[in-house]
Amino acid sequence: MPHFLILNGPNVNRLGSREPEVFGRQTLTDIETDLFQFAEALHIQLTFFQSNHEGDLIDAIHEAEEQYSGIVLNPGALSHYSYAIRDAVSSISLPVVEVHLSNLYAREEFRHQSVIAPVAKGQIVGLGAEGYKLAVRYLLSQQGGESR
């Protein structure tokens, strides 16, 4: 059974209260609950991890290679400057899809650059929580199709 890691970075735990005009009112728990139901329908497993600490995210990326079929990564603002996360992603053989709830390219200029995107399989931005599902569907398609 395909098993994917949903990895969320700094401030994603503040969803629902942080800039709801940008990120919406769904909490991270709401999103995880919805994704859990989505995974059940596809007969796949998802594991969720969120940290506000760069090193914890790097450790999770390194450890993922032994446990998962791919990673959906929302690095938050770390996407703009974390060469350490970029290096962690490029050091593993798992496919990684970068996801952002908001459209980075419609926000402040400094958000228009991701140092992670060039080493990820792809990037999904601006589609809200639906972006996670699209990323999972892509990763699943790379496993030889949808389960069952």
UniProtKB/Swiss-Prot annotation:
Pathway: Metabolic intermediate biosynthesis; chorismate biosynthesis; chorismate from D-erythrose 4-phosphate and phosphoenolpyruvate: step 3/7. One of its GO terms (molecular function) is 3-dehydroquinate dehydratase activity. GO terms for biological process: amino acid biosynthetic process; aromatic amino acid family biosynthetic process; chorismate biosynthetic process; quinate catabolic process. Belongs to the type-II 3-dehydroquinase family. Its EC number is 4.2.1.10. Keywords: Amino-acid biosynthesis, Aromatic amino acid biosynthesis, Lyase. It catalyses: 3-dehydroquinate = 3-dehydroshikimate + H2O. This is 3-dehydroquinate dehydratase. PROSITE patterns: DEHYDROQUINASE_II. The record marks 18 as: Transition state stabilizer. Coiled coil: none annotated. The keyword Ribonucleoprotein does not apply. The keyword Ribosomal protein does not apply. Substrate binds at residues 74, 80, 87, 101-102, 111. The active site is at residue 100. It is an enzyme of class 4 (lyase). It comes from the Bacteria. Homododecamer. InterPro entries: DHquinase_II, DHquinase_II_CS, DHquinase_II_sf.
